[in-house]
């Protein structure tokens, strides 16, 4: 759906509508909702039941907050329409079920903005939509519905036998089911009941498959849009935590900071060492493993390498005694 911008003197310029986070434009979303509503209504009519839907959104009539917006904003009573400060009118609408807001564009008058809201509401909510101009839209729907009924009556799809031929309806643009299996066999005249039952079964299965496919695609896109901001927030939080940890973590010294060689350098340096400069650790620790003196050994006998005792406590080992020690001045 293209959005038009108009001013008092300039000619209308066609511009592309903005794409949302999921990559779909407003026109694409409205088209999907329109197809979905047409399929639901058609399947409900064939089964003889009313389509089950939620109550459509009322649409805000308050416009902007009090004291905000343009001068005529407080006098506007259209749904989903409000006025900017500079006088332009904007239209917005919320999607069914999820309630996400769709921006419909900027318009020179409130009536055009209200018409854009009605168009979007009709596409999203079908016949249950709450509109600003229900009479004008109702007349348009009656004309299109009469055309679709004529097209449906003239081009009935018949299923019979095992042979199927695909037929596309090109004469009626308002028919939501333009792609219907049209099978025509001469043997259908002999089995009208079986043909009717087969036709109903195929239509119901086709409608169910289309509804299921549409819902899966739509809700998949909605979930992706909702998960994107969460993923972005988680990534931002992780980055902030990493930065905080880096700031709080002290500057730790590594082996390289002390100038110690790496293992590869040690292996390479072993080839340049002199074997005479090396020693065995077992030889160094051998003396520690030798047994000490026996407890029964005389404490008065001292080894030759002992210097712990006073010289007066030493006894001669050759049979001579120390004479005249009293005259020594100690």
Curated annotation (Swiss-Prot):
Entry-linked CDD domains: AP2 (cd00018)
GO cellular component, one term: nucleus
DNA-binding region in chain numbering: 77-134
TM region positions: none
Chain ranges for the short sequence motif Nuclear localization signal as given in the UniProt record: 13-54
Coiled coil: 230-247
Disordered, as annotated region: 1-24, 46-71, 225-248, 283-330
Function (record text): Transcriptional activator that binds specifically to the DNA sequence 5'-[AG]CCGAC-3'. Binding to the C-repeat/DRE element mediates high salinity- and dehydration-inducible transcription.
Identification of the protein by name: Dehydration-responsive element-binding protein 2B
């Amino acid at each position: 759906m293209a959005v038009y911008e108009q001013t008092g003197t300039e000619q209308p310029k066609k511009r592309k509508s903005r794409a949302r986070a999921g990559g779909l434009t407003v026109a694409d979303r409205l088209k999907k909702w329109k197809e979905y509503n047409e399929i639901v209504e058609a399947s409900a009519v064939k089964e003889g039941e009313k389509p089950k839907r939620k109550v459509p959104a009322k649409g805000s009539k308050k416009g902007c907050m009090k004291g905000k917006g343009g001068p005529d904003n407080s006098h506007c009573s259209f749904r989903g329409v409000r006025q900017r400060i500079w006088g332009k009118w904007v239209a917005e609408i919320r999607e069914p079920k999820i309630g996400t807001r769709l921006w419909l564009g900027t318009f020179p008058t409130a009536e055009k903005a209200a018409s854009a809201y009605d168009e979007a509401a009709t596409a999203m909510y079908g016949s249950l939509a709450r509109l600003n101009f229900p009479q004008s839209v109702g007349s348009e729907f009656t004309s299109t519905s009469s055309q679709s009924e004529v097209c449906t009556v003239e081009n009935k799809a018949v299923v019979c036998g095992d042979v199927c031929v695909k037929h596309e309806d090109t004469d009626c643009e308002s028919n939501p089911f333009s792609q219907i299996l049209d099978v025509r066999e001469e043997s259908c005249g002999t089995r009208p009941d079986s043909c009717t039952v087969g036709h109903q079964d195929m239509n119901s299965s086709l409608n169910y498959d289309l509804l299921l496919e549409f819902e899966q695609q739509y809700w998949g896109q909605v979930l992706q849009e909702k998960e994107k901001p969460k993923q972005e927030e988680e990534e931002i939080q992780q980055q902030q935590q990493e930065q905080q940890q880096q700031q709080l973590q002290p500057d730790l010294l590594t082996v390289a900071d002390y100038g110690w060689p790496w293992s590869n350098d040690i292996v390479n340096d072993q080839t340049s060492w002199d074997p005479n400069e090396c020693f065995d650790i077992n030889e160094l620790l051998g003396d520690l493993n030798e047994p000490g003196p026996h407890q029964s050994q005389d404490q008065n006998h001292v080894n030759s390498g002992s210097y712990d005792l006073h010289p007066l406590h030493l006894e001669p080992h050759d049979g001579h005694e120390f004479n005249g020690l009293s005259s020594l001045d100690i």
